[in-house]
Amino acid sequence: MVSSAAMARSNGDKPSTSSMEEDLEIEQSMRNASIIDHQYEKEENKNHRVLNAFDPADKTTFSDMIHVDVPDTKTLVERSDGITKYTAYNIHINGWYHGSVRFSHLYEFAELIKQKFSQRYKGPEFPAKKLFKLDPKAIDERRQKITKYFQALVQHPEVARHYLVEKKLLGFQIDSFRATSQYVTLDVFLGNGEKTTIKCLVSDSTLEIMKIICEKLGFKNKDQFIYHFGLFMAKGRDPTNACYSVTTENFNPLLTRFLRNFEAPFVSLSTANQKYNENGHYHFLCLRKLIWDSRVEEPLLDDGNFVELLYKQAMQDYKNGHMDPVKEDLDSKLKSCMARNDSKMFLRTCHQLSTYSYEIMSPCSCDYPKPGTPCEIKFGRRQIIMTTRDETGKPKPSIFRATRIRVWRITQVMDKISFQFEYLMAKDTFEWITLDTDQSILMSLLLQSIGSEILYEHNNMTIEQQVMKEKHSKGNYVEKSEKLPRDPKKPIIVLKNEVEDTDPLGVMEHYHNYNRMLTTISDGIPQRNQAFTDITNDDL
């Protein structure tokens, strides 16, 4: 018997939507859905490599996701004499180069963690010091051990979410950057491409930069501002047009990175432009809203500062065609509002558009309705919209609601990164959807932001309560799910929590019952969507 999901794939239909009666059945199905243990191949398989990931909570906004890797090393020269050489280990976080750190500094960090957390940590030990100089083979073995140590360390909320880890990661980045000046200026672009320049320290973290921006723009409530907006790294959307400067005329950002508090935006931006610019496509910083439902945005329209900032982004999205198609009557109304600069009415008109408030991702390949299907992706309105084309070239949008996504994860086959989520296609029918994209980590963070907004709303929490809850949060709980079938001939890297079975810190039982508001996003293991179990009939 062919399942409804399989028929949907073969016929290219949209994911099922539900009537009011079906909603009740689906809700019951979702609440009773069991999570199957995720079985992974053994590490003896030479074609298989296991990576780790973790999400520590940002102390003021949404959960961070940290995936740490130490892929290689480099030889550096001592600053003191300019002659003596030493080996530095290149640390990458969330797929981006973070810094090059010498062994002694990493060892000091490990000793600090051991002292702070006493005997509770029983994961992989940090490699010991050696009396003699290491040969290349020994250096690589040490690198692998350092990688395993960090990947195990960040799996444990009590450790990874501690301010010491955040502070040390920030310090590694800053020390590695070797800035020539302590005080700098930083350009941040608002939603319409308008540039605001702030003065800051090279070492200022993302949170500090957000506070400076908040003050510069005249917002009185820092918590509310930081909760509703995020600092992103972006580049020009048109790959054929080199972008050496950003103006209000050419502003059409393609987000590449959601900056978190373990990094300094000035350093992250400078490093990205040193290492990753191609054909004149330089990265820049921009402020984007993190609001996924018009009902959340509506109360903000009583504050003139929020209205102005939201209007700038909405107007630019409209000009760039990101709200198309727009009905003729609403289109005329939007143009009229723009002509008389009626920002509040413009936003309220946007709230009537189903195409408003989306972040447009890069085109990618997906396996829905069949493998290798080109698609366009956008995140917003508490859902993911994938637009494919039929044989005649006609666009066919498929809508995936956030409340129907049970788990999501990131995997890697060879050099190909994929974002995968398990979706409730029909009653008791779940199916994995795979997107092959280099924006996988960004998509995970956006989906987490959407889930957090849903949970906050269901908990009837004020912004102040939400922020305080996150500030005092001590951990997340991650559940497992079934693994995806794969071609056995292809080596696959599944980002997995290696220590989840042993729980060296003995804290996971406590976190299982902790407030599920702070769901972990993990590119390491399948992530259970807590909004999935807290939904109401209106969400289905």
Curated annotation (Swiss-Prot):
Superkingdom assignment: Eukaryota
Disulfide bond positions: none
Binding-site residues, a 1,2-diacyl-sn-glycero-3-phospho-(1D-myo-inositol-3-phosphate): R102, S104, K129, R142
UniProt GO MF annotations: phosphatidylinositol binding
Record keywords, A-Z: Cytoplasm, Cytoplasmic vesicle, Endosome, Lipid-binding, Membrane, Protein transport, Transport
Its membrane topology: Peripheral membrane protein
PROSITE patterns: PX (PS50195)
TM stretches of this protein: none
A Pfam family: SNX17-27-31_F1_FERM
InterPro entries: PH-like_dom_sf (IPR011993), PX_dom (IPR001683), PX_dom_sf (IPR036871), SNX17-31_FERM_F1 (IPR048763), SNX17/31_FERM (IPR040842), SNX17_FERM-like_dom (IPR037836), SNX17_FERM_N (IPR028666)
Predominant localisation class: cytoplasm
Function as written in the Swiss-Prot or TrEMBL entry: Critical regulator of endosomal recycling of numerous receptors, channels, and other transmembrane proteins. Interacts with membranes containing phosphatidylinositol 3-phosphate (PtdIns(3P)).
Domain notes: The PX domain mediates specific binding to phosphatidylinositol 3-phosphate (PtdIns(P3)).
UniProt similarity note: Belongs to the sorting nexin family.
UniProt protein name: Sorting nexin-17 homolog
Organism placement in taxonomy: Eukaryota, Metazoa, Ecdysozoa, Nematoda, Chromadorea
